[in-house]
Amino acid sequence: MKKSVILVLFFVALTAFCGENKGEKILPKPDMKSGKPLMECFALRRSSRSFSSKPLPLQIISEVLFAADGVTRADGRKTVPTARNMQNQKVYVFMADGVYLYDGKRHALVPFLKGDLRKHCGTQAFHSKAPLVLVFVSDMSAIGNTPELQSLYAGNHSGSASQNVYLYAASKGLATVVCGLLDRSKLKTLLKLKDNEQVIFSQPVGYPRK
């Protein structure tokens, strides 16, 4: 019996060790009671293009991503509504140390690319300064059977996610803005996206520059 328990504990520890070696970051749980009242956040919501390079704490990053694409229910439904619950959206996270893919089910950052690649998230220089840049990607094959419907649904899904991030930023005194001026073809290649996957827009997040 003791040998069985020791063996189980060994494999648990080994799994955790391997996860750390891969650079995966398990995010802290969001604080559901923090921040300003919702109605106040509506009034404070702003688009800001002026960012401090000060790093964001992991707790803030956790809550930004939860707002953007977090799982809220046991059946896997999220903070963001999608048509027929398609859940066709991915959120790539660009930071100074690399690019990660957000895993909402596990609330974790999965390493994707090494190095500071924030400059590829938009044509404006502030993308390289903001400590966190989200890039929203949509699987177009999962939404609708015409280009018009695909564009409509993809924009709606990413728009809902970005508004969640806007309201969270307002709640925490952060700066953010949605950016459509970006080289989508270059990002598609960089992120090794499939033919049916499309970059929608980016959204830098950080402390406002004083």
Model features per residue range: what roles?
Residues R45, V64, V91, L132-I143, ...:
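Small-aliphatic-rich amphipathic alpha-helix that forms the alpha element of a beta-alpha
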Residues K192-K210:
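A glycine-rich helix N-cap at a beta->alpha junction
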Residues G19-A130:
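N-terminal amphipathic, basic helical "cap/leader" segment at the start of enzyme domains
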